[in-house]
């Protein structure tokens, strides 16, 4: 019985350790980015990130590669977020009202917070 309890505790510890690592990674992002990545859904309400690996990939892209904002940046990040490469996804464009929106409307959170330097 003690052995079973010990195994259960190890299993829970392993699961919680993985969750903690994910939260540590998210803690490095500005809160609106982290919230967007964690809660992004498509128009049918399906989560865009099916695994933590894809979320971490999007996180790493945001942190390490967004130094110059252009259409390629939008297209690549859209590919990470939706799994499809498209030039009709304008995540970082500040004038997105003039362009088609193919991604979740909550993506506009990025527009006001991103300060490229």
From Swiss-Prot:
Q: Which InterPro entries match?
A: UPF0321
Q: What lineage is on file?
A: Eukaryota, Fungi, Dikarya, Ascomycota, Taphrinomycotina
**Signal peptide (UniProt feature, chain positions):** 1-17
Name the record gives this protein: UPF0321 protein PJ695.01c
Q: Which residues are glycosylated?
A: 39, 65, 71, 104
Name the protein family.
Belongs to the UPF0321 family.
One of the record's GO cellular component terms: cytoplasm
- Organism field: Schizosaccharomyces pombe (strain 972 / ATCC 24843) (Fission yeast)
Q: Which Pfam families does the UniProt record give?
A: DUF2430 (PF10353)
Q: Which domain of life is it from?
A: Eukaryota
> Which keywords does this Swiss-Prot/TrEMBL entry list?
Glycoprotein, Signal
